[in-house]
Amino acid sequence: MVAFPLFHSKDGLIMKHIHIIGIGGTFMGGVAAIAKEAGFKVSGCDAKMYPPMSTQLEALGIDVHEGFDAAQLDEFKADIYVIGNVAKRGMDVIEAILNKGLPYISGPQWLAENVLHQHWVLGVAGTHGKTTTASMLAWVLEYAGLAPGFLIGGVPENFSVSARLPQTPRQDPNSKSPFFVIEADEYDTAFFDKRSKFVHYRPRTAILNNLEFDHADIFADLDAIQTQFHHLVRTVPSEGLIVCNGQQQSLQDTLDKGCWTPVEKFGTEQGWQVGTVHADGSFDVRHHGETVGHVTWELMGEHNRMNALAVISAARHAGVDIQTACEALSAFKNVKRRMEIKGTVNGITVYDDFAHHPTAIETTIEGLRQRVGNARILAVLEPRSNTMKLGTMKAALPASLNDADQVFCYAGGVDWDVAEALAPLGSKLHVGKDFDAFVAEIVKNTEAGDHILVMSNGGFGGIHGKLLEALK
């Protein structure tokens, strides 16, 4: 058993059993896994569960209650309730917790107080690419023998779990690793704490990957997000390191508000750069104009090469030399739901990707295009995120989807006029609200050699399996 201190309330009571409200989310599911490994009794509740998190929780033997009813409080009788940001006032379970005066805490605060405060935290922040970049960074440290803990919003193929405590490093079998890699999310913490999650983490090494407007349901504009990112910058110690995308003016503007930490930039001649990109997808790594390494991998897109530069810089801060980092990246396997091949039937390949913001959609299609050349790409989109449902980003969607040969957008559950917003795509656009008819329309328009790229941040009704079955 890992010797972690149990959480104590202010009156000295030991909080051994935690019950997680919203346990099915990628972050809270990761908190559950870490708490279980640390010796806590863990249970939780959520409305709907999707793989891979549902599979992970089941494998860990964690009891999950379906729904947010108040009766579960008597069923589980937890010592403290860890509240995810899916929870809202008005939910029966939340009102009961408040009315009964039961102890509660947010997921990020629980993690910070019980795990992170003891470790060298490496935080990966940015509007896009957090999960992939955090997975790369955790793997590079693992490959180097540093055995980090991590909590990532997806399941890295190199690890098969989304979260774990620090393990025994190769160099010192009598200790535990000091390193912990975390996906540092800008979304708000909980209904009672509207600060971004990452404010709780206090990283010693922070990657700022990119910054643009997103999460229109909680942020009024880009300035509001920049304010939260600057709160993160304020928490990085002067002996730490900020690794920053040098191509993003929005990040430079954030640093200009005040920065007390050394900064290394990537994507610029003054820092880390992608050198020659070879036909097989491998690329050279340059630092201050000099070629210092080479990465051979199968990942698609310039965005992933930029992610790699950030990881090499951050890993070097933790003591990993450049060559070892490049070797590790060459052995990196991507995260589930990041351009994940779900199957191939009759020469037609179906992919699954988490992309749900115009920039991420565009770079995902661009990456696939680089891989498949002139073969047809059928983009299948579910506008499911809160920002997408509000229609805040609808004007940017046509350009982001333009490189696809055919575009299929599922309009079920969306209040804005999808056909009107995506009209610039012309005859290659297909919009549907009936799910079964939507699947049939995709299949009708396929031909051998096609690549069907499904993009959603939810389960999308199991569309991948339905497509593969219908294509037989």
Predicted regions and their residues:
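Beta-strand->loop->alpha-helix junctions that form or flank phosphate-binding loops
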Residues: 65-69, 107-112, 151-154, 258-278, ...
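Short, polar loop motifs at secondary-structure junctions
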Residues: 47-50, 68-70, 87-88, 246-249, ...
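Phosphate-binding loop of NTP-binding sites
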Residues: 7, 13, 34-37, 58, ...
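Acidic-glycine-rich active-site phosphate/pyrophosphate-binding loop
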Residues: 275-293
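ATP-dependent carboxylate-amine ligase
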Residues: 1-65, 77-79, 99-102, 171-173, ...
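Generic structural signal for helix capping and beta-alpha/helix-loop junctions
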Residues: 52, 74, 114, 158-159, ...
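BRCT (BRCA1 C-terminal) domain core and associated BRCT-interaction motifs
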Residues: 67-80, 85
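Glycine-rich beta-strand-to-loop/alpha-helix junction loops that act as flexible
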Residues: 84-86, 246, 454-459
